[in-house]
Amino acid sequence: MQKNDDLLRERRKDEHVALGVKQNENLAPSSLEDIQLIGTSIPRYNVKDIDLTTTFLGATVPFPFYINAMTGGSRHTKRINAELAEIAREVAIPMAVGSQSAALKNSSLIDTYQVVREVNPKGIILANVSPEVDIQDGIRAIEMLEADALQIHINPAQELVMQEGDRSFSHWLSRIEAYVKNSPVPVVVKEVGFGMTRETVKTLAEIGVTTVDLAGKGGTNFAQIENDRRRDQAYNFLLDWGISTGQALIDMQHADAPKIAYLASGGIRNPLDIVKALALGADSVGMAGQIISSLKKDGVSKTIEKLELWKEQLRGLFVLANAKNIAELKETPLIVSGELAKWGSLREIDLVQLANRK
């Protein structure tokens, strides 16, 4: 029985990658297209003046983007993790691994995650567990990678669509609180593409969480992935569940939103999307599907070249926004229009204030 469970988990990991890459060819809107930065025609800064440094889970890092939780747990995904770690090392950005549950249950799969630290011995690496994993195993996951931080992914919608998924969730909050109190490294709580509302963030802040990844809709859709894995595809009606990355970011502009650090991910397609997310308060921006699709299509070297180009393009966008650094970018005026503006108004967000920031 254990062997069958292990094989099922390995197959699921491989299916997640294959279906995620396929999805990246036709992504849903992230709502970031409804956000327009108000730039300048007379920049105050030169490109060389721009400082992209940001704070990432207590560490100072040179660039405001990272490789988000992706994969691990099978022979095939070991190679992918090695290549992602090489990209992270060469581009000097943090990286999160995918859920380590497979390795915690089957020690023969530990190397499919540890390869990340072997390839990138000095980089910032995030371990990854579900709230289903107890504290002792969570610490094992951290030690497995000599991780610098721990990502706890919350994914009730995915679990409900997954035939073999969890059906009990009421203990998650107390488990997350225990992690916050006992983890030897910083903790970030992350959605998996369904977005966090300000109410969810407030609930997490009340138990001591200091950083969240809003992880909105617009990137990899795990409800669709799990539905596609089902023979009956019985959850077609749930494929649009959740809030977009743009909606999650706008929701955090409410006066009552908790004042904690947040990251943004979900449908980030280009440097302009990164800048928009940073302007709406994110400290850094995560990408998963975009990077793995580039890796599959173009290989490691071309993906590194692409991300190095993004750094230079980010500096140019900061110049256009008249912002020398991320702190100044967060004061740049921006217009919210279209469906996102309607949504923001119903959520009582002061869109006029955003449009007239100084």
Curated annotation (Swiss-Prot):
Listed binding positions for Mg(2+) are E159
| Obligatory cofactor(s) | FMN; NADPH; Mg(2+)
Which family does the similarity line name? Belongs to the IPP isomerase type 2 family.
The UniProt record gives the binding positions of substrate as: R12, K13, Q158
Tell me where in or outside the cell this protein is found: Cytoplasm
List, in alphabetical order, the Gene Ontology terms for molecular function in this entry.
Answer: FMN binding; isopentenyl-diphosphate delta-isomerase activity; magnesium ion binding; NADPH binding; oxidoreductase activity
Q: What is its EC number?
A: 5.3.3.2
Q: Which residues form a coiled coil?
A: none
Catalysed conversion reaction: isopentenyl diphosphate = dimethylallyl diphosphate
Keyword annotations for this protein, in alphabetical order, are: Cytoplasm, Flavoprotein, FMN, Isomerase, Isoprene biosynthesis, Magnesium, Metal-binding, NADP
Q: What is this protein called?
A: Isopentenyl-diphosphate delta-isomerase
